[in-house]
């Protein structure tokens, strides 16, 4: 039996993109309770692995609640805002909580896979800007436009 991916977000368009990219389930956390939906999708067990790429005010605590016994919770964001954690959730469920910067010496291999056409990033990059318009790109990202997925600077001279 394989794994099923469940994606959470606040923006329906991004959830639709995740669904079309292969996510088994999507949850709009503004409309649905994350913990309840995860329990429903996992027949009451909770998630085996949860990844917090948002690192918002309550995203980690939500994932700790939605992750099942002996599960793993990975944080990937770079928020400097303090987060209150209920240690009982970690200890009672025997959760493994880790931080990841995605720097496990695989970046070169990832580039190779992209160049070989073996890693499909269709839909991942929503906007590109030439390097000379870097400030415009940063301003655009700062606008929090809901259409933004990833913004890439290109080196077209």
Regions found by a protein language model. Name each.
Residues 1-6:
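Short, small-residue-biased leader/transition segments that mark boundaries at the very start
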Residues 7-8, 75:
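Short beta-strand "acidic-cap" motif of Rossmann-like dinucleotide-binding folds
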Residues 11:
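Conserved SAM/SAH-binding beta-strand->alpha-helix loop
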Residues 15-17, 25, 46, 101, ...:
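Bulky hydrophobic/aromatic packing residues
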Residues 16-96, 156-157:
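Glycine-rich cofactor phosphate-binding loops and adjacent beta1-alpha1 units
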Residues 27, 40, 99-100, 123, ...:
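Alpha-helix initiation/capping motif
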Residues 57, 61-64, 104, 108-157:
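C-terminal hydrophobic helical "lid"/dimerization subdomain
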Residues 72-74, 84-124:
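Rossmann-fold dehydrogenase core element
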């Amino acid at each position: 039996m394989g794994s099923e991916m469940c994606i959470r977000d606040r923006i329906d368009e991004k959830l639709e993109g995740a669904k079309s990219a292969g996510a088994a389930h999507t949850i709009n956390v503004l409309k649905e309770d994350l913990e309840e939906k995860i329990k429903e999708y996992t027949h009451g067990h909770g998630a085996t692995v949860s990844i917090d790429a948002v690192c918002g005010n309550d995203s980690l605590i939500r994932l700790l609640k939605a992750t099942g016994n002996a599960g793993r919770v990975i944080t990937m964001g770079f928020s400097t805002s303090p987060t209150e954690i209920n240690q009982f959730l970690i200890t009672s469920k025997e959760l493994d909580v880790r931080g990841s910067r995605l720097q496990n010496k695989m970046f070169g291999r990832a580039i190779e896979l992209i160049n070989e056409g073996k890693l499909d990033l269709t839909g991942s990059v929503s906007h590109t800007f030439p390097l000379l318009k870097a400030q415009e790109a940063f301003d655009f990202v700062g606008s929090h436009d809901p259409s933004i997925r990833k913004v890439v600077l290109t080196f077209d001279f």
